[in-house]
């Protein structure tokens, strides 16, 4: 299944969750798009709830189904809870951590920064958004890219960097000190439903 490239606001309203992280998509119309408006949402079956939860998380991180399922399978080989491990692996993606650093306003914008070669890991350019960052590694913006307007604007409005990142705003650099804990990850996601979906 290909990555969704349509309007983020429309998908956010359909899934009932802010994919941009700003919440603006749901401020005025917190219901699915379409002619039926707020009356369109219907009670979902157990399978429907599981599928919806999977789609919410997959689109939140901007992944294809193949990438998403591969990461899920990798999480299943780790000790501990499958669902929590899955969330932790998703959070360790390079494009996501660029977003968490506040270098981009959305994960989609962060993915573009990585794709276009503006981001380095431990001093080496990495242009693979799905690159999994390991604790202790340092993420930074290339010196030639420090003056990017999109980065400056994102930094100005960002007022929160998670505790598993130590961020230096002057250097535009952060160290991924440890894996995130479940309490630091999206509370609106029920990963148990996703585990149930793939276990069918």
Curated annotation (Swiss-Prot):
SUPFAM superfamilies: Alpha-L RNA-binding motif. Keywords: Ribonucleoprotein, Ribosomal protein, RNA-binding, rRNA-binding. The keyword GTP-binding does not apply. SMART domains: Ribosomal_S4, S4. GO terms for cellular component: small ribosomal subunit. Part of the 30S ribosomal subunit. Contacts protein S5. The interaction surface between S4 and S5 is involved in control of translational fidelity. One of the primary rRNA binding proteins, it binds directly to 16S rRNA where it nucleates assembly of the body of the 30S subunit. This is Small ribosomal subunit protein uS4. It comes from Bacillus cereus (strain ATCC 14579 / DSM 31 / CCUG 7414 / JCM 2152 / NBRC 15305 / NCIMB 9373 / NCTC 2599 / NRRL B-3711).
């Amino acid at each position: 299944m290909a990555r969704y490239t349509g309007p983020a606001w429309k998908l956010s309203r359909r899934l009932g969750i802010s994919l941009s992280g700003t919440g603006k998509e749901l401020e005025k119309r917190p219901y699915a798009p379409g002619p039926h408006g707020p009356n369109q949402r219907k009670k979902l079956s157990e399978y429907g709830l599981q599928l919806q939860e999977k789609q919410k998380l997959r689109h939140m991180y901007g992944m294809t189904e193949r990438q998403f399922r591969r990461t899920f399978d990798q999480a299943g080989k780790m000790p501990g809870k499958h669902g929590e491990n899955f969330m932790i692996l998703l959070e360790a993606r390079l494009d996501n951590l660029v977003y968490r650093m506040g270098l981009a306003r959305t994960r989609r914008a962060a993915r573009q920064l990585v794709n276009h070669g503006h981001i380095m890991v431990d001093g080496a350019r990495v242009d693979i958004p799905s690159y999994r960052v390991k604790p202790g590694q340092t993420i930074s913006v290339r010196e030639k890219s420090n003056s990017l307007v999109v980065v400056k604007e994102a930094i100005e409005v960002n007022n929160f960097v998670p505790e598993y990142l130590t961020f230096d705003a002057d250097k535009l650099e952060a160290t991924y000190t440890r894996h995130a804990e479940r309490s630091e990850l999206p509370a609106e996601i029920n990963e148990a439903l996703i585990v149930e979906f793939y276990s069918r």
